[in-house]
């Protein structure tokens, strides 16, 4: 009977030590395991734009009951880059080397803002700018296709996300040329996102 008690005690101690050791290893490996447990994010695109577009359409059409055959999309992947039609202003701004959507800042005079105030004071104006290509969703691809087929009119909906402020600075105060103080609400952006 004494042997069983000793064996049970040794087993209990060994399992406790093993449990503590596993927890410590898990905490030490947490740096390496952290990204695997983090929410999924889309990796930055490194493929050729034509191949990426083909992959997007393939993902869009996968499983759709009235899906177009994927071989209809193959001419897009085989297209030789050449002279294209003139790009629109949004496409020119979001050229391939453009920075991603983010907060930018510029020091400007209040009168340059065009809000009707005459002042020589300068303010730090924060604004949102950048490309939102990584934020394109299946919705955007589907809407773009419907617009191409003229099922949705152009002015009704946008088929791509825009870099916009999601939060604003509380207020900005300044003195005009007549020595009066003015306070403007939500003049500068505080946070930006692709919406």
Swiss-Prot record:
Keywords attached to this Swiss-Prot or TrEMBL record, sorted alphabetically, are: Disulfide bond, Growth factor, Secreted, Signal
A GO term from the CC aspect: extracellular space
InterPro entries named among the record's database cross-references:
Cystine-knot_cytokine, GDNF_fam, TGF-b_C
Gene3D superfamilies hit by this protein: Cystine-knot cytokines (2.10.90.10)
Cystine bridges: 101-163, 128-192, 132-194
Q: Which GO terms describe its biological process?
A: cell surface receptor protein tyrosine kinase signaling pathway; cell surface receptor signaling pathway via STAT; glial cell-derived neurotrophic factor receptor signaling pathway; nerve development; neural crest cell migration; neuron projection development
Q: Which residues bind heparan sulfate group?
A: 147, 156, 158
Database matches in Pfam families: TGF_beta (PF00019)
CDD domains per UniProt: TGF_beta_Neurturin
Propeptide feature ranges: 20-95
This entry's Gene Ontology molecular function terms read: glial cell-derived neurotrophic factor receptor binding; growth factor activity; heparan sulfate binding; receptor tyrosine kinase binding
Lineage, top-rank taxon, reads Eukaryota
| Principal location | secreted
| Tissues expressing this chain | Widespread distribution.
Where does this polypeptide localize? Answer: Secreted
List the PANTHER family: GDNF SUBFAMILY OF TGF-BETA FAMILY, NEURTURIN
- Quaternary structure and interacting proteins, as annotated: Homodimer; disulfide-linked. Interacts with GFRA2 coreceptor and RET: forms a 2:2:2 ternary complex composed of NRTN ligand, GFRA2 and RET receptor. Also forms a 4:4:4 tetrameric complex composed of 4 copies of NRTN ligand, GFRA2 and RET receptor, which prevents endocytosis of RET.
Briefly, what is this protein's role?
Answer: Growth factor that supports the survival of sympathetic neurons in culture. May regulate the development and maintenance of the CNS. Involved in the development of the neural crest. Might control the size of non-neuronal cell population such as haemopoietic cells. Acts by binding to its coreceptor, GFRA2, leading to autophosphorylation and activation of the RET receptor. Heparan sulfate-binding is required for signaling.
Family note: Belongs to the TGF-beta family. GDNF subfamily.
Q: What is this protein called?
A: Neurturin
Q: What's the name of its gene?
A: Nrtn
